[in-house]
From Swiss-Prot:
GO terms for biological process: phosphatidylinositol phosphate biosynthetic process; protein localization to plasma membrane. It holds the Pfam family EFR3_ARM. Keywords: Cell membrane, Lipoprotein, Membrane, Palmitate. It comes from Danio rerio. Belongs to the EFR3 family. The keyword Acyltransferase does not apply. This is Protein EFR3 homolog B.
Length: 816
């Protein structure tokens, strides 16, 4: 009966007649608008008929596609679009299944125009917000098909571009339709992200070549909307902008895999561009998740080529610069630990020539590539540090210092076949990292920012024989002390006639700075002095020493510090004159030049006219007679120094007595000024330069002697007068010499004395200790006093006697 009714138009259902009437006899005439309005009114009046209308339209479209009547196909899709836009949200579910079935039919067609037509209809549908949830709708086919269209390889370039853009728009529509609908299949699942993200990256990468051709402004404006790369970037940003906290990993992982599979880390440019898009698109509080994934990927590629690892590190460098301050994540030190570990691995790879000590030669390692990687890691460490607040940067500095192998303090790190040279390279690389972290580091409280646990090992490095390490330490110290950006003004050593042209920034020394200098000043002075006398020091070392002296004068100086700095400068002059020190001629001239340049600076900072005049006179005399003792002739490319240095005296030297006299008139401590500066040698010196077991033993003996009970006995209070203090200051030099001689004898004894003598000495000390312990026990472990009193032994010693209670004699009043 149904078939018979279908043959007679009047007997057919109304919705079919309305659908048939929208199709003209000639498809070129287009949709019959009057009949389309009737169909739309009918659909709105009877929404329960929507599913039947959709099914019938789908049936007609399938038939027209099979018969290649593409004009009617376009009319059917136009009608579907209009019905879709006109329907109410509550009733749209009745119509969508038929609509998606028709879109799927078009996307499966071989004709590019039909694929593009279906995609455009799907995009219109995706922009409709639905109130009614759909439980059974699936978009898996559309994700796969649109991703496939993004990789289209059609022969005609224009058609290929249109197909790819249609695929990108389709993916954008899928994301919009599903990303906020929890009842849909989760678009963030890896099975979907592994298709969507690589498709977008493929088109983003393909657009790089066309963008680099620099078209004319007219062409650019015309094609701006048609660029697949532009559309891809917009879609990619929208996808990432919708990503919640738990979806970041699934969105970033395909990016990492795509860059791995297509070897795009080595070029760096595209990888950096991708992650810039990611970082600027996601929410700022999620930035640390991207950083953690990059660090994990770096660990996974620990045995990849240096160029791949360097590419990942370069991306980390850019990402760290974009990440908001403090958003590196809860495990800040873990970030630096990972980077330092890869720095260590790179050093081992460079020295051993293999990624695996068991398979030497499995891969060819290029040293220059490993060096580039190391520099990239160091820059990245600095970039991460710049995003941290001051207190966290101090923690990072301590953390890095704890990784540095320091003889006697921190054990050397286990090395994979690299040996001592590996430890040295690690020291250099970690100190370079530390230098990057300290760049721009400014703190108001030096005492808390630079604790002993950081400063002591740092200063011990200044005494190592390695010139490169000493220079790095000086650069770090200078960077830490410079808080007002005065360092560039002291980068070169020169005699400045008027320091006002430098426009120095000087603040009054704070209480915290005074406490810092009170605690650490002597250590700093001693290391400046000892570093100056190192024979391997060259021009950069002296320039950094000058900067260090100048910055201490600017940042941390009070009246006492100024006096001590002048004493140090005069001690450097005496060091250059000393015949005991076997210094080369260049070093002697350089020390003289350093001393003269600094005294010229400090004299103008103190603003004492007589002091400035004396320094000026000495410099003028040197310019006339011995210019090779001034910086202008020493610190140049070809130093103008003699082969031998004659004995210097008279007006060409700075006179301590004269300086003491002129500064004393301005209220400075003349007694302190008159006392020559002599550095105190401490245990730290031996820790940094220890070479023999004898020195180790001598250090232990000194510690024992300082802690012995004999030293702890109280002495009667001594009356302190002005004369006593004066004599103590005058005699301090002799005491220091005696202490130095005593230490030399101890070292010599343990180096040359036979083992039996050393053992006997230690045995005697053990016997003495035991006797002292016996005395202490005898005093502390005594029986309680007895009411019966004491008895006297034949040796005259009193002994306590225990008397039974019944034998005790009590007073009469106590007995009942």
């Amino acid at each position: 009966m149904t078939g018979v009714c279908g043959c007679c138009g009047a007997l057919r259902p109304r919705y079919k007649r309305l659908v048939d009437n929208i199709f003209p006899e000639d498809p070129e005439d287009g949709l019959v608008k009057a009949n389309m309005e009737k169909l739309t009114f009918y659909a709105l009046s009877a929404p329960e008929k929507l599913d039947r209308i959709g099914a019938y339209l789908s049936e007609r479209l399938s038939r027209d596609v099979a018969r290649h009547r593409y004009g009617y196909v376009c009319i059917a899709m136009e009608a579907l679009d209009q019905l879709l836009m006109a329907c109410h949200c509550q009733s749209i579910n009745l119509f969508v299944e038929s609509f998606l079935k028709m879109v799927r039919k078009l996307l499966e067609a071989d004709k590019p125009n039909l694929q593009i037509l279906g995609t455009n209809s799907f995009v219109k549908f995706a922009n409709i917000e639905e109130d009614t949830p759909s439980y059974h709708r699936s978009y898996d086919f559309f994700v796969s098909r649109f991703s496939e269209m993004c990789h289209s390889g059609y022969e005609d370039p224009d058609i290929r571009t249109k197909i790819r853009m249609a695929g990108i728009k389709g993916l954008q529509g899928v994301v919009r339709k599903t990303v906020n609908d929890e009842l849909q299949a989760n678009i963030w699942d890896p099975q979907h992200m592994d298709k969507i993200v690589p498709s977008l990256l493929f088109n983003l990468q393909s657009g790089e070549g066309t963008e680099s051709r620099s078209p004319s402004p007219l062409q650019a404006s015309e094609k701006e909307k048609e660029s697949p790369a532009e559309l891809t970037e917009r879609c990619f940003r929208e996808l990432l902008g919708r990503a919640a906290y738990g979806n970041i990993k699934n969105a970033v992982t395909p990016v990492l895999m795509h860059l791995d599979n297509h070897s795009l880390w080595e070029g760096k440019t595209f990888a950096v561009r991708c992650f810039k898009i990611i970082m600027y698109s996601i929410q700022s509080q999620h930035s640390h998740l991207v950083i953690q994934q990059l660090l994990g990927h770096l660990d996974a590629n620990s045995k990849s080529s240096a160029t791949v690892r360097a590419g990942i590190v370069e991306v980390l460098l850019e990402v760290a610069a974009i990440a908001a301050s403090g958003s590196v994540g809860p495990t800040v030190l873990e970030v630096f630990n990972t980077l330092l570990r890869h720095l260590r691995l790179s050093v081992d790879y460079e020295l051993t020539g293999s990624y695996d000590c068991t398979n030497i030669g499995t891969k060819i390692i290029k040293e220059h590539e490993e060096r580039q990687l190391q520099e990239a890691v160091i820059r990245t460490i600095g970039s991460f540090a710049n995003t941290l607040p001051t207190y966290q940067r101090s923690e990072v500095m301590l953390f890095i210092m704890g990784k540095v192998p320091i003889p006697g303090l921190h054990p050397t790190l286990p090395s994979i076949g690299s040996g001592p040279e590996g430890n040295r390279m690690i020291q250099v690389m970690l100190l370079k990292s530390l230098r990057q972290v300290t760049c721009g580091f400014q703190t108001t409280n030096m005492l808390t920012a630079l604790p002993n646990s950081f400063l002591d090992p740092m200063l011990s490095f200044a005494l190592l024989e390695d010139a490169e390490i000493r220079l790095l330490v000086l650069e770090i110290l200078v960077s830490l002390i410079d808080r007002h950006d005065n360092l560039p003004k002291f980068s070169n050593i020169s005699i400045i006639s008027d320091i006002s042209v430098l426009k120095l920034k000087v603040d009054k020394c704070s209480r915290q700075d005074n406490l810092f200098m009170k605690k650490h000043a002597q250590h700093l002075y001693r290391h400046i002095y000892l570093c100056s006398k190192e024979q391997s020091s060259v021009q950069p070392h002296f320039e950094k020493l000058y900067s260090l002296l100048a910055l201490i004068s600017m940042e941390l100086a009070n009246e006492e510090v100024v006096v001590d700095l002048i004493r140090v400068a005069l001690a450097l002059q005496d060091l250059a004159l000393s015949s005991e020190e076997m210094l080369p001629v260049y070093n002697r001239c350089a020390i003289h030049a350093l001393s003269s340049a600094y005294l010229n600076l400090i004299s103008q900072l103190t603003t004492v006219p007589a002091f400035c005049q004396h320094v000026h006179e000495v410099i003028e005399m040197r310019q006339k007679e011995i210019p090779y003792l001034l910086p202008e002739d020493v610190f140049i490319e070809n130093p103008k120094i003699p082969k031998t240095l004659e004995k210097l005296e008279g007006d060409v030297l700075f006179q301590q007595a004269k300086i003491t006299e002129v500064l004393g008139g301005s209220g400075y401590n003349t007694e302190r000024l008159a006392t020559p500066y002599v550095p105190q040698f401490t245990d730290e010196d031996r820790l940094s330069k220890r070479k023999s077991i004898g020195e180790t033993i001598s250090l232990q003996v000194e510690v024992d002697s300082r802690n012995s009970p004999e030293k702890e006995e109280r002495t009667p209070a001594e009356e302190i007068t002005f004369e006593t203090l004066k004599n103590a200051i005058v005699d301090s030099v002799g005491v220091e010499e005696q202490e130095k001689e005593r230490r030399r004898q101890v070292v010599e004894k343990f180096q040359k004395a036979p083992f039996e003598e050393i053992a006997a000495h230690c045995g005697a000390r053990a016997t003495m200790l035991q006797s002292k312990l016996n005395q202490i026990f005898e005093i502390t472990i005594r029986p309680p006093p007895s009411p019966s009193g004491t008895i006297t032994s034949s040796y005259g010693q009193t002994q306590s006697r225990s008397v039974p209670v019944y034998e005790m004699k009590f007073p009469d009043l106590c007995v009942y």
